[in-house]
Amino acid sequence: MKINVLTLIVTCCIVFTISAQKKPNILWIVTDDHRADALSSYNIATTGKSESALGYVSSPNIDKLASEGAIFVNAYTNSPACGPSRGSMATGRYPFRTGHFGFQLTHQNPDFVTPTFSQTLQKEGYTTAAFGKEDSYIFRWGPGQGFHDAGHYNYKVHFKHDLQKNGVGDFWTQPAYKKGSWKNTGTKEHILKSDGTSHAYYIKKKEGTISNEDIAKKTAFEQEFEILRSYTRYNENLIIGGENPLPANQTIDAKIVDELKLYLAHSNTEFKTNWGATRTGANPNKPLMINLGFHLPHTPVLPPKEFRDVFKNKTYNIPAFDEKELLNQPPQIQRLFKNLNFSNLTPEEKQQAIQDYYAFCAHGDALIGEAVEAFKAYCKKNNQQYLILFTVGDHGWHLGEQGIEAKFGPWEKSNKGAIIVVSSDKTKIPSGLVQEQLVEYVDIAPTILSAAGVKINENKYDYLDGYSLYDFIDSKKEQREYIVGEINLVAGHRAYLRSKDFAFSMRTRPQKKLSPNEQVKWALDCPVEKAELVLYDLRTDSNERQNVATHRKYRKLAAWFRNKLGTIVLGDGRVECDWSEANTYDISNFAAGAHDGILDIPKSIIP
């Protein structure tokens, strides 16, 4: 009997190992604040031209990747900010169904919380690893609220907490503390230069004034590297242009890719990280899922010289904007403009901001090429299939559209990205596909889970709000007629809905602290001016410059959208949670089923 039991155990282990090895390795790439029009392949697919509407871009490596599979050119984030967007991607759920609308320290203790897809993959036999910026803002209850690792990944290298913390990077900003204590004394900028020297200086102090020495250091840095700061907006120290103090192979994003390559090159063996820690490389006997999160082209926008030199003499079209457009905008939108102003820069500064942004994207393209080749080589060496999913921007980025350089808005430039999906199995994803259907970032989790063999149609995965992108492949069939999202940053709670013909947004909550779902119907019942409606007719105003919500012939249509969007985000499973507590939340279902993916607008109210 002992022999039989032992034989059974060994057999089961062998079967599990073979089954696990049949699962594809998965590389999920995410860039930050990345406009889809920084990709020539996207521009060609959408306009027939390689350049963006603003001008020259360069993306040969990403274009090659797109040619190997499918590019989804109408992909939308479900929240135009890093934390809630990444939380939505990680869970496959809308922000209004997770209670995650901004940079709250959410956690997994409340009863309604579901696992992230990376946690599910671990149960399916995967090793999960994250490099760079993951930052879904989903933590573990400590007990108590805090930055407690929830175990989304078995292996992690964070750009800030591992690399920059240990002196690896190029330029970064971080809080300063009194020596020998945790007393915050202000904020410092840190610079590493190619000659090996490091520099730091205060840009803000809690007490007293900044020293002349620090002012001189800052000025010298700005002059040497042609730094452009966002002096026309609320955060006037934000760097929106300049030259990286390090060469292309030494930037923080280059080091992120270097850490990935070290991990893949040292299978089951120890190696030294860039900051000198001893780590063990990937286990080729288990399927591997990697989240490669680039910090670029997020601010500080500092492309290395070899890329910046290519772009600095290009002339770009500055997006048209007139402050008169604000006259017909509600208070929330006016606050967004005031806090994120780009229009008051000089024409020369606007040119630099756009040049340096696209140059930074080109640097990212080169690094993505390196990472993809290293991942493919690992898969080939171990005779393993793969899936590569590239989320082009956790959200979008304005370069003057609506008068801002930022995200956070209800407009297309804040919310639109692209998704590229490539499989080594061409029967699943053929090469050279351009998919024009509306897809949302909540579709990413179901796609990755499906690729891993998870049966997402089972009842236990009913919580997933998205579709698998496999359902769209090589087809023109739409799965939805609109996309939705919500955010509570910069100007308060605002939700948006977008279809082929119309873009609508509205304020969803009063500007005051409320208990979970207190006055949840406020945005539907309050006077219409309090709901701060914005409506664009994309048939005639594709650049979203004229709010027609208050125009006489559009009022009924705006009211219809107010009810449609309001019932979706406020009454179809809306979660609001007091994240400072272990398990305090409320779920609003007064309009269950409202989010049906259908826009049945009465023809009589469409102008």
Tell where the protein language model's regions lie, with residue ranges.
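Long, internal low-complexity/basic segments
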Residues: 21-24, 31, 36, 342-348, ...
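A long, amphipathic alpha-helix that forms part
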Residues: 247, 251-276, 343-389
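Substrate-binding rim/cap in mid-to-C-terminal beta-strand-loop elements of soluble/periplasmic
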Residues: 90, 373, 406-463, 467-478
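Catalytic-site neighborhoods of secreted/periplasmic enzymes
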Residues: 87-246
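Active-site-proximal N-terminal segment of extracellular/periplasmic enzymes that hydrolyze or transfer
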Residues: 21-70, 305, 543, 548-554
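C-terminal, low-complexity/hydrophilic appendages and adjacent surface loops
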Residues: 412-413, 487-550, 588-589, 597-607
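Histidine-centered active-site microenvironments of extracellular/periplasmic hydrolases
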Residues: 44, 300-303, 310, 374-433, ...
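Short, structured active-site-proximal loop/turn typified by the sulfatase FGly-forming signature C/S-X-P-X-R
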Residues: 43-86, 92, 125-129, 317-319, ...
